[in-house]
From Swiss-Prot:
Pathway: Siderophore biosynthesis; mycobactin biosynthesis
Residue positions, PTM O-(pantetheine 4'-phosphoryl)serine: S41
GO MF annotations in UniProt: acyl binding; acyl carrier activity
GO (cellular component) term, any one: cytosol
InterPro entries, A to Z: ACP-like_sf, PP-bd_ACP
Location in the cell: Cytoplasm
Function, in words: Acyl carrier protein involved in the formation of acyl-S-ACP intermediates within the mycobactin biosynthesis process. The aliphatic chains carried by ACP are subsequently transferred on to the mycobactin core by MbtK.
PTM entry text: 4'-phosphopantetheine is transferred from CoA to a specific serine of apo-ACP by PptT, leading to the activated holo-ACP form.
Name assigned to this protein: Acyl carrier protein MbtL
Biological process, per Gene Ontology: catechol-containing siderophore biosynthetic process; lipid A biosynthetic process
Induction line: Induced by iron starvation conditions. Transcriptionally repressed by IdeR and iron.
Alphabetically ordered keywords of this record: Cytoplasm, Phosphopantetheine, Phosphoprotein
Length: 84
């Protein structure tokens, strides 16, 4: 499975905007998922499903919860691509 960093980033932004109704003006690589972006446990669950459906990458709950920022989440997704 291959994907470029820009594809991961673009798709993640799309998920945040379309699936989670996040205002993308609040989203930067350093934005904290909970404090800055405003994700809660329901949003994390919806996000996990959307990431798997759109990117074909299954993140465990543990992997997702270790991501504090948008950039860390992008890196975790990209790492899954490298591992597969």
């Amino acid at each position: 499975m291959t994907s470029s960093p820009s594809t991961v980033s673009t798709t993640l932004l799309s998920i945040l905007r379309d699936d989670l109704n996040i205002d993308l003006t609040r989203v930067t690589p350093d934005a904290r998922l909970v404090d800055d972006v405003g994700l809660d446990s329901v949003a994390f669950a919806v996000g996990m499903v959307a990431i798997e459906e759109r990117l074909g990458v299954a993140l465990s709950e543990e992997e997702l919860l270790t991501c504090d920022t948008v950039g860390e989440l992008e890196a975790a997704i990209a790492a899954k691509y490298r591992d597969e």
